[in-house]
Amino acid sequence: MAPTQPRDAQRSRVYRAETPLGGRRLPTLPDCAAFRDDVVGSLWWVARFPDHDLAKAPILRPGNGARQAFYREDPGHPTITLPRRYRTVGVVLHELVHWALADAHDLPNHGRTFTRILLDATAEFMGSAKRERLAAAYIEHKVHVGPPPRVGPAGGYDYGWDERLRLGRGRRFLVDYDADASAQGTLLSRAHRKVTLADGEARHVIPERTIWRVRGSGNGRTAR
């Protein structure tokens, strides 16, 4: 059974921070689709989310009568609903980040991992000035942002490593570190820049600076 998704505590603050920023308008759904394809087909996106490619990209829906834009896992294919007033590059990016994290059920929908990815994507696809405005708005509205992703030996990016460790005490993880080492166990502590996992009687103490990927393992929380 997958772990229960954490409470989406900063959702409203994220919305308040993003709303004034605007962004280039995309008047029609084909315009939105062209921007979606530019993002998902870019080297930047492929390097970070190789399993989320153009063939699997969300279908765009007009949202006639809908009051807001939203991402949804519909049967057979994900969708993004875009009412006319929400057809901007900023909104499309926001919803694409939800798609990138669709399988991350152990992370909040608008948590630190989400805001870090959106901040990085804003810099890449909307420019550094817009990125700085978004970063300032996050600070103003007390939105928490995760640290940069860790990059593994093969060049893969892990954005969720920090938030998983932050929220995951008592959960089982598979932690990859150094060039080719890994350890599995229940997270006991994260202190003094070290992560401690328990696997039966064994204890794994891993320097945090060496970690490049953290994945859930087993069946969620251990029995208490």
Stretches found by the model and what they are:
Residues 1, 166-167, 217-224:
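Short intrinsically disordered terminal tails
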Residues 84-89:
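Secondary-structure capping and boundary motifs in well-ordered enzyme cores
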Residues 94-96, 129, 210-212, 219-222:
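Surface-exposed beta-strand edges and their flanking turn/coil or helix-capping segments
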